[in-house]
A protein has these predicted regions:
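Bacterial N-terminal signal peptides that target proteins for export
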Residues: 2-10
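C-terminal motif of bacterial Sec signal peptides marking the signal peptidase cleavage site
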Residues: 20-21
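Repeat-based blade/solenoid architectures
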Residues: 319-321, 380-383
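Beta-propeller and closely related beta-sheet repeat lectin domains
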Residues: 85-88, 158-159, 186-191, 252-256, ...
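Beta-rich carbohydrate-recognition and catalytic domains
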Residues: 25, 29-32, 36-80, 92-183, ...
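Sec-dependent N-terminal signal peptides
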Residues: 9-17
């Protein structure tokens, strides 16, 4: 599996197909607004500012999907970060946006051919975007090996942002620019509490060549938001609790939803395609967690103990196999956006009357092309980690 293909950032407009609420696993029939389809599509097209550089990708009834070519260009880079996966974002109180990345390329790319030269491969990295969508709005918070001498080795290469305590490389090797490969962290979701950024980092064990990328444990890192980007204190790592949740193997908090009921809902998965959920006691990731678990009769309840595998097998919260769930709310209804299984090239949308499901009435929202807008071979292998960035919305779109 080639996990290092560059992804795209898509802008998805939800037009006038309004989804209703649901009760348990019985979905109430949908009632659509009477706006004629062509009129509704034209209305959306008329709201698009040409400066956004949106390119129509697919029309699916009242849903229109666009490629965001402006963000494609923004992340088509020749120096420093020039590709990666993960790519989660969190809106900060000052209007800036926190970006986390997993496996990334740092170094130099030839501008005309897009060929990578000498690049390093840090396993996680972070960035802050100030309001705006220009190059100067991207403040990269990487620990660069050296940025002064283009002819010298490791020019604009970077170190991994946060290391796993079990990683085996010596400090001298890290200073030289070497990257840990045995134990590492990949980003989970993040939130703000008491004007500090809380980020979940999922532990990854690569020590067994027959079972690579095994999830083990969660680290909770806390960052300062004092000052402005570029200040010494802004995004300074205050603490990293490497033993925050040593027993986690299902990635609770890979994505999250902060609800008005006072809880943070933390979504994970069993067997990649069974979505499961936990929640915090308060809007604070350090508050106690409880897990939503189904019994043998199919009745769900919240429990304080981490679920066993048998319990998790009974605790799926959605009706159709999918991956990487993103929950949001519109009106009185919660929606879950997720990717079809087996690296599927379709996106699904579900609905529920609760942030913990059940999420039902699965519908195909849109599909991805089999080709990328790039030089050379435009086909690609696996499509994964399709993430929702609600604060990038310009006009109410997803």
């Amino acid at each position: 599996m080639n996990r290092y293909k560059n992804g795209k950032i898509f802008s998805l407009f939800l037009m006038c197909g309004i989804l209703g609420a649901c009760d348990k696993f019985e979905a109430i029939p949908l009632e659509y607004k009477s706006t004629p389809l062509e009129e509704a599509q034209e209305e959306v097209l008329n709201t698009i500012d040409p400066a956004w550089e949106l390119e129509l990708m697919e029309t699916n009834g009242y849903v229109m999907a666009f490629k965001d070519k402006k963000y494609d260009k923004l992340f088509t880079r020749t120096l420093g970060w020039n590709g990666g996966d993960g790519v989660l974002t969190t809106l900060l109180p000052d209007g800036n946006a926190f970006w986390s990345f997993n496996d990334s390329f740092y170094g130099v790319v030839e501008g005309e051919t897009r060929a990578r030269k000498d690049c390093s491969f840090p396993r996680n990295s972070i960035m802050v975007q100030t309001p705006g969508d220009e190059e100067e709005n991207l403040v990269w918070l990487a620990d660069f090996v050296q940025t002064t001498t283009p002819e010298a080795p490791r020019y604009y290469q970077a170190r991994t942002h946060i290391r796993h305590p079990k990683a085996s490389l010596s400090d001298d090797k890290i200073q030289e620019g070497e990257i840990d490969q045995d134990w590492l962290y990949w980003a989970g979701d993040a939130t703000v509490c008491n004007n500090k950024l809380q980020v979940l980092w999922n532990g990854v064990d690569n020590t067994n060549p027959d079972a690579l990328m095994r999830h083990e444990g969660i680290c909770l890192a806390t960052y300062s938001l004092e000052g402005t980007p570029g200040d010494d204190n802004y995004m300074k790592l205050i603490s990293a609790d490497h033993h925050f949740n040593d027993v986690d193997i299902y990635g609770y908090g890979s994505t999250l939803w902060e609800d008005e009921d006072g809880h943070i809902y933390l979504y994970g998965s069993y067997n990649n395609y069974d979505m499961i959920v936990a929640r915090t006691a308060r809007h604070d990731l350090t508050s106690p967690w409880e897990y939503y678990v189904g019994d043998e009769q199919g009745n769900f309840s919240w429990q304080n103990t981490y679920p066993t595998e048998e319990e998790v097998k009974r605790s799926r919260i959605q009706e159709t196999d999918c991956s990487m769930p993103w929950v949001f709310k519109k009106g009185d209804t919660y929606y879950m956006l997720a990717q079809a299984k087996w690296f599927g090239r379709e996106m699904y949308i579900f609905r529920s009357d609760k942030p913990y499901g059940p999420f039902v009435d699965c519908k195909r929202l849109f599909g991805f092309s089999d080709f990328l807008d790039k030089l050379g071979d435009q086909t690609y292998q696996n499509l994964y980690m399709i993430n929702l960035h609600p604060h990038l919305s310009r006009n109410g779109e997803l």
